[in-house]
């Protein structure tokens, strides 16, 4: 057999497999997904597979299988293992001699990530119809399948029968895509694949290829022997309704935020600076992975930093007036935020080329922020050189403005549906930080960010350049108020009140009825943040066997080798009693139990040593003090600063001052005194944690204190004597010893003076900062003497701490035993004292701290950071779940009050989330005297130090369960239990649960998320229970009738005829998915699928209505045609229900109650936008999502059935396009020029616009027969600009007729045989559909004229024998040839164009003869030349004559009387609206600056037409693909013609297909179809603070010409507007810009123009122009201010065949050219002279004379022909 020896041993064991020859074939059509059938007659989901004829790509004869088969059976094709003959060759011998490793055999593409023996490696499929003609020894598969699995043609494969069909079903399938893909499209794609087989690497499509994706992996959860489901990768699988689809975008908008802070410029442990890790490590690897995956992201890279300023520096800034952007944080520190955009919205093929520029900008950033910014301001103010100095200091990583950066990126995404880019999907935010993933943040900003992230369905990636810390990450710490006592809540009428623990993140003291509140430190583990650790050292490749230290002692590590007097180090012997003597070998479970027991003894809030019958000392309440003072908490509580007090005070002073301390603190100090300890105020400088001691600066001990170190053992002995029951049989590190630290000793009568007492370990280390005791009952004011520049160790995200300044009296109880310190005593006692330095972030518990000062450390802010705002929330705070937070000082209270020790029951974990406690101890280790109640577990009793768990199950239901389960989770980051971690993942991450089938490891980089961000999953399993829904939600119900109005357009007619209710339900689900809803399904791991999940009962109106969830989600319900579909999104839950008896759909909605403040956060800072030359001021508003009325779903549902047709109340997608001249020559092609016609460039521009409109007319939605059809899109041609054309009454009447419709003929006549006179008579009848009016064109006025398009349309609508456009054109040409009509200038034959005007020839125009005598047949607009107006005046160049873009507002006297426009309508004699030769200019001057007539209203003029487009006329999609088109009506071909498309959840690829078609057609005629922003570029900073238009100033202001208006009128320049004439000329005549939108104030003041695609009240501050390439937009500010420039990001960042680099460079070159010209005063002066019109000549004839002369000459040339009865 070819390819090796065939091993058929496996094939003979049973009859469930067979060997067949495999043949490949190439399918004619891709059967995968919906693309198998290009036309979808129905939008209803098909069954997974018909039992009779399931779809299959495998062709096989049933006779080839040795068992009975039927359609739908599951089979698998596998390769047969072939053993290759082991014949040694010369090459293998040489290879073995050289010691080279054999090359790894490359596996087939579908099997690359499938572990051999641990996943399915074959191709599974469902058996289709029998193929009796196929060979019984063959099986045929598509060639793509054979390539993916390595099947070779004409080789045997093994075909297996699969008995367990469930084992072939895929649980998860991940797709990659590179286009804009809506969530509804994802859902439809998944449903279209149900019942089909997919394999890894397969490409699937929907809607005829409009939606395309590729399978990345297939996973199925398989249960192991212990019953735990473990995900395993499959090479293929069958899609079912239960399959969860994961979509990752390779074309997203990516934001890379790189944090600049103190650590950025420092070295890590491996000798590499963190800034180098970014530019030489992380970014190159990221870009390489992007290239490998073929991504096409649009990338923005931003550097962000926060600079702190001391008080003296603030005074310096105030002195020089530089405090504009100065702010204060919650701790009272002064700071400024800096953001610099390094790369802005760029798409590149090779991102490696950007690294040098990024590196240069990073290297310059330190000087730019700390010096250059203020230096530029000082130089501008003329400051002396000696006054210039560097001010500010980098913040540490944990103090960074990371939330501000995230919110700034979210601001433009708030309206992601506006200016929709049709080539990308999703937003990825990545923050690269040298920290460890912990950030100290403001509570309100954290809450706001959480709400916004959940609302958008997004996540953020933190990439930390350090090694993973020993605490949980990501971690946000904040300060919050909390109630001191339990909050009572009535569970029902007459029910017993229960205590409630509020979620502190959502607790606002000023909105609560609770008055007795305090401050507390909280730690939150955000579910919307994913953390990766890029701790790669490039000169030390990663090795699995390399030991990596996780915890280092900085002070000892930094001691030199000579300092280590190792000979004096003596390790005490172990006590025999301390050695455990197990009676049997310990199992793994035993060891784990011992470790957990040990950890519980450390982290439990109550001592486990208090037993029944113990001594009063044993049973005394645990007086637990906080581990140290939190700098942030102190800042919140500090009310005043007082003078410092001496560290050594008389004992009486200590006792006297104990009343000013909190009860716990006072008790602790009293305990220390009574035990003979010297009570020393704790240093505010943080200390290393016993769990994670970080590096600190070297400090020395004073000789006095070092001599006291010897007393440690004496203190230990005394403690042993005082508390024998506690310390008996204790051993170093044992649970008993550790638990002793949480069972403090009650106060005893004082027996010695302070000075005589032996020193406790608290005195054995120096105090590196002085502490000032404040008499304030609420706080102490702490001041540290700090160096100007703190030194930091590697890997620090927070400041480093001093060494532990307190040790346990017994060596085994301290982190550093006395024998270690004694060994360093010579060194420490001789070194100089050092100052306090900021401590690195440590994680420790406050509620397990001992009574002395052996406590973990916390970040210690600088001097300026410790001045905080006075506490407004009441007395002093108590710490809560506070790793690495200091305990606030307590309010005045007696130092000790006995209390009863109560026992805590084992608690149960729940899905609700409260501020997490430290893990409660097991029941067996808790006191047995009594049961600890909920209050005791939730709050620490004042003065008693009892640990209070915030996980009480009876309180969880009262907490805002949904709020936390979808947003917020507090946690003890030092010791989170496995169950807690699961709760965190399941709570806030429930919306993202089905994105990660496998649990990821945080110590690795999450490359899949960084390469291709995942979209929000389509399904979730979160649903609140009845109690939660009653307490947390408001509910309501409405119904949607299942019938369709005539105006509906969201349901296809064929689907409505098949099953209207089903079609409406599917569309309602589809629209909600597009708005970020998720379908709620049964939990994936539900062990009893047949058991219904409890639903919120209050929604059940009828007992016989099924409301249970289904595992298959919406697809399963739609197939059944009955039941309910549950959906959720952020704050909303909807249930859509088929009514069992009525033709209607019942919608139950639930909206979360908002009980917290929702005020917006105002931010200000300094930004350096791309293209600018320095930092500039910026501000932004961070707003909460609007929960109550963000989307009107009632309106949306009734829009589906046609009861409503307005999009306004909804969140709909929109994008704007403009049609502009491209400046290129038209593409020559057959049919471009009509025969015997010579069209100029302007004529081709008009023709191109007409062709575009005709194409759009073919996309108009065809309504069902018997209903009115939509009118065709038309253009009313003009050569005026928008602000001028509104003064042309005839034009405005034509506009109104087009918008509101016009009458058409009755089509009862026949044209054949009719005389010319009869045709002329019909043409002149009023209201017959043919508009004959006076028209302005190119400075001339044509009376009694009509255009060719209107005549052709009139012939079609009037005569029954004129059918079709071609027939009408033939008849119109015949009328022209027979002398009935002619072109107004006799330069063209008949062409049905909108811009070519015709008139009746004499004598057929007798009905208008009186008008011709009165108005004149052809009038010059201003008749400035005696030769008439057949051509422009000689003084007007061709460019000037053709450029009506160059106009300006008239300079009118405000006091001039206002002239109202003539509002007469059609139907009157045309002479009634006659205007004299200069009427437009005169009217404009009168009304432009005037006010509307008193008592009157502005005249509203609608300028747009609205139509419904069918984007899928060929029915490729399975649903109605419609969009609303808004288009201009009046158009000047030299200006931009505007389109705006609005839609609700359509397949974007069909929109892109239409755009490409219109773009290609436009280019043929010298036009360009360009996508542009909806709003003006001047408003860009309102949405995005770090983007702004670039100002381009004029070096020379335009000259002031008093008679400029007269000169412009003399050259027939519009209405003679003179304002900004020179600026407009620069743009249009010099640099090829085209007028896009005119400024609002250029329109007459008594006219209000209305555009249906603009919001009411939206005004354009300045006129906006677009470059003919579409790459740039410019607004004209005027004067020396010049212009505002902005690249058109929608064009610059769009994908192109040639790449995007050339577009970016081209846009920059255009801007550079304009900047250079505007900065050259000499060139400007010369240009002003060139474009200035000459003054009018004195010998000109008057307008009347000129017109009479012209008319006489024209009459001589045109003699009326005798009227004849010519028949047609």
From Swiss-Prot:
**One Gene Ontology cellular component:** vacuolar membrane
Region Disordered, as annotated, extends over: 86-105, 637-816, 847-934, 1419-1439, 1457-1476, 1729-1768
SUPFAM superfamilies reported for this sequence: Winged helix' DNA-binding domain
Biological processes annotated in GO: intracellular signal transduction; negative regulation of TORC1 signaling; positive regulation of autophagy
S-S bonds: none
Q: Which UniProt keywords apply?
A: Membrane, Vacuole
Q: Name one Pfam family in it.
A: IML1
Repeat: is it a keyword of this entry? no
Write out the coiled-coil annotation as residue ranges: none
Instruction: Extract the signal peptide range.
Output: none
Feature: compositional bias, Low complexity = 688-703, 756-779, 879-894
Indicate, by first and last residue, each region the UniProt record lists as having compositional bias (Polar residues).
655-670, 704-732, 902-914
Ranges where the DEP domain occurs: 1326-1402
Q: Where is the protein situated, by its record's location annotation?
A: Vacuole membrane
Family according to the record: Belongs to the IML1 family.
Query: Which PANTHER family does the UniProt record give?
Result: DEP DOMAIN CONTAINING PROTEIN 5, GATOR COMPLEX PROTEIN DEPDC5
Q: Any idea what this protein is called?
A: Vacuolar membrane-associated protein IML1
- The organism encoding this protein is Cryptococcus neoformans var. neoformans serotype D (strain B-3501A) (Filobasidiella neoformans)
